[in-house]
Amino acid sequence: MKTAHEIRPGNVIMLDGSPWVVQKTETTRSGRNAAIVKMKLKNLLQESSTETTFKGEDKMEDIILDRLDCTYSYFADPMYVFMDAEYNQYDVEADNLGDAAAYIVDGMEEQCQVTFYEGKAISVELPTTVVREVTYTEPSARGDTSGKVMKPATIAGGATLSVADFVKTGDLIEIDTRTHEFKKRA
């Protein structure tokens, strides 16, 4: 058991019978010096998010989830199938992937971390950066441009993001999977 004041982003807590991952915490002190902790939480079983407030001394159960490095194998509607080093396969529901599904493509070589709760694969964490091919973007706009010029692009997997003006269709780019931002040309 930990107090609300000891919980950090990335911890998983049990709340109302469900596991919630802490995405953000903010501690403030009231006039009477009692700490109030505001947390942004994401339900690992239902992919819902909420913001809630706790007193600093409130106790909550901090749980440890099993994580396993896996590679993406294939998609069997509505499940994404991942395989570990011993060739064991784990099914993760498409709804549990959220935005990560747009970065999962056939033949991807990056290792993902599959998270388990009570023996069931419930979510997938992508690497911090992935390299993907630009499948469509408009030609560069030459002329009256100064500074950092961005344009929309679609990548393999279907995600749309802003890329630098010099990126062309067919280029490989590096993307930050946490912020969904273009980092550089690969």
Curated annotation (Swiss-Prot):
SMART domains: EFP (SM01185), Elong-fact-P_C (SM00841). Pathway: Protein biosynthesis; polypeptide chain elongation. The keyword Cytoplasm applies. SUPFAM superfamilies: Nucleic acid-binding proteins, Translation proteins SH3-like domain. GO terms for cellular component: cytoplasm. It holds the Pfam family EFP. The keyword Transferase does not apply. GO terms for biological process: peptide biosynthetic process. It is found in: Cytoplasm. GO terms for molecular function: translation elongation factor activity. Keywords: Cytoplasm, Elongation factor, Protein biosynthesis. PANTHER family: ELONGATION FACTOR P, ELONGATION FACTOR P (EF-P) FAMILY PROTEIN. Involved in peptide bond synthesis. Stimulates efficient translation and peptide-bond synthesis on native or reconstituted 70S ribosomes in vitro. Probably functions indirectly by altering the affinity of the ribosome for aminoacyl-tRNA, thus increasing their reactivity as acceptors for peptidyl transferase. Belongs to the elongation factor P family. This is Elongation factor P. It comes from Shewanella loihica (strain ATCC BAA-1088 / PV-4). The gene is efp.
